[in-house]
Structure formats: C-alpha cells, structure tokens
C-alpha cells in the first residue's frame, strides 16, 4: 500500500517536559518521526511545551508550537493549522491522553482530522484497564486475575476476592504513576486513593500478584496490511514487581528456552493483530516455568522501544511514522543497511544491558524501594560480546561513585536489601557473593534468575584471581575480554590506571570495534554505529578527513538533563555542515545524539578516560570537544589533556576553551583573584577544611551563609545555613561529599534577584544570547528557578553592568565557545556568583526565545570562524516575553518535601511565550502542570519574612475574585493591612485543617513558604499533601507574586496568543 495522497499535513504531539517515567526517548522518537514524514513530502505541525528538545527546533517541522500540552490549546492549533491527520503514539503517554481527550471533545469530527496509525479504539482497549482485560480474554490470552475499581469501597471488596498482596495500576498514567504493591489492606486503600486521583478516568485496576515471575518484553511492529514483525525481545533482570523502567534489562533475552520464546512471539503477533495497532508497540509478559500472563500493552513509542531501537539499530519511530501515512513494511527501506526492507526482523550478535539512573543522591528522604511506579530519571546502555562484558561496561557508564564493592553492608543488611528491591540491589548481589553467599540463596531471596547471579559470580571470582595472581599478559587479555575496565584493575592490583594502560599497550592488548547493523553482519551496513570489545578483527575503518570527536552527556539525571544532549546534537550538526567528519561517544539510549544518523560515527561507550582514549587511538581525530556534554565531559577535560600530552604518539588536542581556563573558573580561589583584577564584586566568602574553621568563617561573614563543596553539578549538598547548630550538622554530612576538596562558605545574598547570562566568545568578541531574570530569589538553585527573557524589573544601569561583566569574564577566561555566568543584583549592585565556560542548561531555552542557535554558533567558532564574519555581533531584542518554568518530580517520589533550595530538584522544563508577562507566566504554569485557578479558594500560610510582600499578592487575588483563607498568624497580619479572610486551623491543632479541605477538593491553590528547618514540619505536611492530592502549590513569595500578576491578567479576559515559534522569530526579522 503506497503512501496516502490525501494526507498532506500532519500534527505531531510531543511529550512535554522530562519527568520521571518520560525522559528524552520521546525527543529522540519525535525528531525521527518529523524527519521521516518530511522525507515523504508531508507538512509537519509540531506542538510540544519542552524547549530543551531537538524536535522543537524551528527547522524540524513546518510549524513548531511551543505551547502547553493542554487539549483546549491543541484544539486552537488544529483550528488554525487545519491538519489532515494527527499521530498520537509518538508523544508517549502525554500524546495518547491528549488525543483521547480531543476525540471525546469531538474536535476531530469538527475539523475533519483523521487519527493516523493506531486508532483511538486501540488506545482505549489498551489504556482502559477493564477493556484491556476483556479484549485479552476474548482472544484467549491469559491476564492476571483482576478487577477495575472506581471507589475505595470497591477496592475493599477485591481483597475478599483475590487476597493479598495486590498490584494497583491506574488507567492512563505514566511510568506507573500512582500505582504500587499493596501488602496490607491499609496500603491498598492508600495506593488506590492516590491512583484514582492520578488517573484521567478515575479508574484503577487491582490485580492478583505475579511477584517473583520473570518479566519479559517484546517490541512488535504491524502495518495496515497486517504484516507483523518482532523487532526485539528483552528480559528484565529484576522479577515482576519492579517497573520495567526501574529494572536492569538485557537484550536479547538470556534465560528463555526456544519453546518459551516461540510461545511469546506468537502471542505478541496475535495481540497486536487483535488490537489493530499500526506502528510500534510494546508488550510486557510475566513468565514462570512455561506459563505466562500478559501484564500490559503500550500502543505507542515508549522508553522500551527507544531501548529496542538502540539495541538493534532498527529505527522504530521512523518506521511507525511512515506506517501512519499508509506505507507498508515491505515498502520502507531499512535506513541502517539502505538495502533491506523494514519487514526484515533484526538479528543481534551481542548483548546489551540497560541500567536506570536514580535521583536518590538528591532526595535523601525519598523512599528508595523500587516498585511498580517509576522513580528513575534516566538510563544508560552498554554493549558487549558477552553478558559479563556488557554488565561491567554498564556499571562503568553509570557515572556514580559506588564503584563495585566499595560499599559495605553487614549480614543482616545484605539479606534485607536482597529481599527488597532498591537502587543498590545489583551492588548488594556483588557484595553477597564476595561474602560467600551461594547463588541459590541469593536467587531465593531476590527471585532473580540464577543465570544472572552466576554471571555476576564469574566477575567476583575473576576479581579474586586478579587480587592474588600475577597480572601476566595472558591474564590481562582474559580480564579485558571479560569487560574489566583499567580503573578497576588498577584498584585491585594497587597500580595506577596509566600503569595498567601501558601494560596493555606493551602486550598489544587493544580495543577493537564492532558494528551494530541490525542484521548480525549478514548485509553491509551504511550507517556506522560501534561498540568496543577485545577481539581480533576490528570493523571500523578510519578515514583521512578532518575529524572531531564530541563527548556526550551520559544518562539524564537531575542537574544534567536533556539540554546538554541538545547542545551536543547542535555542535555535531554545525560541524557536519562545515564538512568536518564528526564522531560522538555517549551511552544514553534515549537521546537524539545516539540516533544512528546524527553523527558520521557513533561510539556507544562509557564516558570515561579509557573508553574515550580507545576511540582516539583508533580514529586519530584532530580534536576533541568537551564543552557540550555538561559536567560529565567537563570533568574529563583536564585528565584528558594530561593523558594526550603523555601520549607522544597522538596528535589529538582539546578544542575550544582550554581545560586550564575551565579549571580556573571552577577553582573558587583562582576565580576570585581574576574577579578582583577586573574590580568585579563577589559575595564575601571563604573556605574551610574543618568544623572549627567553618564556624570561624561563618561568624566573620555573618549568617545566613551558603555552604557547598567545591566541584559539584546541580548544587549537590549545597545548603543555606541560618545558625551554628545548622552548620555543625551540615559539616558532619557534607565533608563526606568531597574529601579532598575544602568546603566553600559564601555570604547568602538574601532577597537578591538572580541573573543568568548565556554567551558565545571567540576570544575577540562576545555575543550575548540573552540576559535572564530569575523569578525565584537567589538561594533557589538556578536550575529550579523560573526565569524570564527579557528581564522585567532590572534597570538599564544594572543591565549595562551585566553586559560589561560578561564581556570582561569571557575574554578574561580566554573562552572559545560557550559561557554561562550567574550573577545577583541587590540594591543596584551586581555580584558575580559563578562562571561556567561550557554549555549550560539554559542554552536551548535561550536559543528558542531569541531565535539564535547558540550551540551551533559556538561550534563554528571552535571550527575557526569569528563572530564578526558570521554576522553575530548584536544581542537579539525579542518583542515577546518567554518564561522557562521547571517540572518538579515530587509526585513520583513519596516522602520527599516539595520545597526549593540551593540543591537542584527539577527534572525538566517548559516554556511559556506570549506578548506580556502575565499570559506567558500563566502558560508556563499550565505547561508545568501547575494550573493557576481563576476561581475558587486559595490557602495562604507564609513565613514572617515574606509577609510584607504578601499584602499586594492577597489584594490582587481578592480583586480577581478568589476566596482567601489562611492560618491565624497570616490572617491577623493581613487584617492589619485591610485584607480580610477566613481562618483555618494549623495542621498540628487538629481538624478541620487545610489537609482535610484538600482531601475534600475544597482548595484550588496553596501558597506556603517554608520557615527555618525546625518548624518546617507543618509546612512540609501541607506541601506534601498538595502534591498527593494534585492541588497547585507555590513555595516562594516571588512565584506567588508572579502568579497573582498572571491571574490578574487572565481575569481581564485577554486570550492567550497561539503562534508558532517560526512566527515569533519572523517578527524579530530572523
């Protein structure tokens, strides 16, 4: 069936901000779908609220709307653009939910829009838990016994029917949000209440437990001709009871018998046919001794399909998009081999391992147990010839400190941790085997297949040999083949990494590279995608062209998000446009940078010195770029420079800003000297290596002070400390964070306005991309604060000072490429807080707001062009207001207090654009799922320091027609200023208090600013309840003031502007 000629214009819905359960995989699949449709001559209209994505670049689609993913707004875009069809399954759960809502609202009928690919019926039959169960039973497939419920009373009845434990799965939610495992009746009611609130149709499925069964996934594809193929099968190392996004996963499955594989393969094809899904789909099974149950079907591109795409090299999203416009699998050419049709099933001659990356280093109080609801923010993937090699490379890729076996647990802890799955379980298995526990005992405690435990045992036994035997070249060859990195060998033998590396080279033990080609080398591949191993033949052939290697950003985690992948992709694109051969090394399967056709060569490897050097030794690039991959690649800059200097046989150099200059900016003392030279103000500060010194410095500066370790990303272990007791507690916890670095103590500029600047420098001129004014005050991490372009309250004098400082610092640090500078303004004076001569997390937002691709411009500067010759000298002046707001993951992390501070907590971001601040801020909050109410009740409970600013906020809210209520202190204070409202009991004074009111849906907005740590308990319970009951909440007075301004604007009845980013840029003359 050739492409449909009646489909000329297609609307694609993106997935919105990165959140737990929905990470960068949808940018990767969305970008692939956009390109796939454009190849077929179809016009693409894209809507997504997340500016940090490649898919929202103006050139990716014919019209790009960065607007809230809200059904009413998408309807306005449909009214304006009149697309012929819409593809729902590319934007993850968000895309499916909005498509279902629009269908229910009758929008598609009204405007004659067809749903392409998977029909709404199929979405309903998979997402509505009751319909799904009926469909499966109708075709004779087995599902766990279950019942869909809509009330707590119905949930109680299920306990009588099915007994405990039970699994709760809400309908239409993401990453298992709101679900969980209930082992008692109380737990069941608590999880069900949470799940009913989360579900779009207030429905949860309560099902019998298949805990301990193996979890296996099949990635399947079907076209309108009913041709079906199985792309990949994957096996979770963790058994059922842990969400697949939380489990370590291997592909292809390792423990299935051929009979089991054929049984599940046949079931998969039967299911996708029965559901009439067109495109890619993911089916999850529980398997036990030849018996199976179907757990769920995702009728869309998912996190698992991104993994399957990278594991096999098969571009699932690209093919799905072509099927949606009527093409058949045998008409679509496999873009990796360029000569086989997409109907050929991929074959693998290697093993991949995926391990999630969790944010528990940021949320110390959050519950670390892994359940059916996701908590991880990102993941890594590793490729090896054997299970052991793949697993060891995966551990190396995680970029966390828990090097194998460095953590110690006692016997009781080991048994507890094996029984309950946590983020450390794989490390605990290592430790248990080292202690002599048997494979059988560990398998019984964990329900993990003994096959996987025996593979880990093989690694543990090899470690014993390395410790006790002489490291001969035979043993070294054997351990490298097994996958041991040089750093681990150095630890086990008491040598340095360099010594191990030299031993290898002397013995001629060098890494070789194998190709991922979708067909186990049966056909010639056209798009090179490689992994390293230790075998005889090497499949990569270096060219003589000028080439540059770019280091990627690794797994998505808090503090290091998709923004750095965005910068990496832009740098690659710019260099390829210059005719330079460009290579990427990265290990994140969810991103655009690891797509098969982003770079000239892709190396799927851990981002460590050894693996980077392996690529350099083989390919001999002219230069390496480290400034685009965030802290991960910046941390490699100095060591890599030293290693390249040590290796006289290599001519490769680090391009862009010199690592020594990057280090100067990171080293507070050296940087302070530079600032003094330029006469630039900095907050008063000092550093300390002991508790005694810390107290002395803090007393000299005066409390409150901001304390942090040196060299950190995303403000880890950073805190505002108000008194000596607080400081003593911090010193006990923080000195562990970085033993060899002192702790920094700065004057905390209370009430200052924070400013961010992104710029490009070519060592002669400086291009300022934008000056951003933060909405939250200094003291909230810049990555967690909303910010606005252009600044709304900074005077011309202050802006002139900011521009002057930016130029001096960029030229003073000899920056070649990007630089981000954070400043704060207090009383008309500008203080510089820090400078980072590398890509920053605001680059994508700035690029979209002002229409300048800063990362591309920086890459061209590094390639040798000057800003002047490219015509980039003036700071852009947008006519519109752009606001970046963040997405906080508290709803997925029970137990964490939803409060902002100097340590970064957000996972993703959204953007609101309009012609005035009020409407832009309203859009940003709507996009961040924090809808500001225009009617209803607002609860206020504010710390004393914020009360003077509250009066104006309360007046605006009352004038807009909202009812106010608050706790006694706030009510009395406002009454003295002529604002009267109802009093509500404090939480610890008993009922009825605000939490009771939230439970009864009687509160529409919570404004609660936290007091000092000790008396936060009440506030913490209110904020936590707001998250659990899905009530919009605000925790800073600045955000409350911005919200009041937005509500005031919206009540004037002005419509929101619906315009594409292309139109906004056109108005700027771009």
From Swiss-Prot:
Binding positions for Mg(2+) 2 per the UniProt entry: 296, 298
Domain MGS-like intervals: 930-1070
Keywords: Amino-acid biosynthesis, Arginine biosynthesis, ATP-binding, Ligase, Magnesium, Manganese, Metal-binding, Nucleotide-binding, Pyrimidine biosynthesis, Repeat
Binding annotation for Mg(2+) 1: 284, 296
Entries under CDD domains matching the protein: MGS_CPS_II
Region of interest (Carbamoyl phosphate synthetic domain), residue spans: 541-931
Region of interest called Carboxyphosphate synthetic domain, as start-end residue ranges on this chain: 1-399
The EC number(s) this enzyme carries: 6.3.4.16, 6.3.5.5
MF annotations from Gene Ontology: ATP binding; carbamoyl-phosphate synthase (ammonia) activity; carbamoyl-phosphate synthase (glutamine-hydrolyzing) activity; metal ion binding
Residues involved in Mn(2+) 2 binding: 296, 298
Positions contributing to Mn(2+) 4 binding: 834, 836
Binding positions (Mn(2+) 3): 822, 834
Binding site for Mg(2+) 3: 822, 834
GO biological process: 'de novo' UMP biosynthetic process; glutamine metabolic process; L-arginine biosynthetic process
Binding positions (ATP 2): 708, 747, 749, 754, 779-782, 822, 834
Region feature (Allosteric domain): 932-1070
InterPro entries for this protein: ATP-grasp, ATP_grasp_subdomain_1, CarbamoylP_synth_lsu, CarbamoylP_synth_lsu_oligo, CarbamoylP_synth_lsu_oligo_sf, CbamoylP_synth_lsu-like_ATP-bd, CbamoylP_synth_lsu_CPSase_dom, MGS-like_dom
Cofactor(s) required, per the database record: Mg(2+); Mn(2+)
Binding, ATP 1: 129, 169, 175-176, 208, 210, 215, 241-243, 284, 296
Residues annotated to bind Mn(2+) 1: 284, 296
Location of the ATP-grasp domain: 133-325, 672-863
Pfam families reported in the protein's UniProt record: CPSase_L_D2 (PF02786), CPSase_L_D3 (PF02787), MGS (PF02142)
Region (Oligomerization domain): 400-540
Domain free text: The large subunit is composed of 2 ATP-grasp domains that are involved in binding the 2 ATP molecules needed for carbamoyl phosphate synthesis. The N-terminal ATP-grasp domain (referred to as the carboxyphosphate synthetic component) catalyzes the ATP-dependent phosphorylation of hydrogencarbonate to carboxyphosphate and the subsequent nucleophilic attack by ammonia to form a carbamate intermediate.
Cited function: Large subunit of the glutamine-dependent carbamoyl phosphate synthetase (CPSase). CPSase catalyzes the formation of carbamoyl phosphate from the ammonia moiety of glutamine, carbonate, and phosphate donated by ATP, constituting the first step of 2 biosynthetic pathways, one leading to arginine and/or urea and the other to pyrimidine nucleotides.
Protein name per UniProt: Carbamoyl phosphate synthase large chain
Naturally occurring in which organism (per UniProt): Methanosarcina acetivorans (strain ATCC 35395 / DSM 2834 / JCM 12185 / C2A)
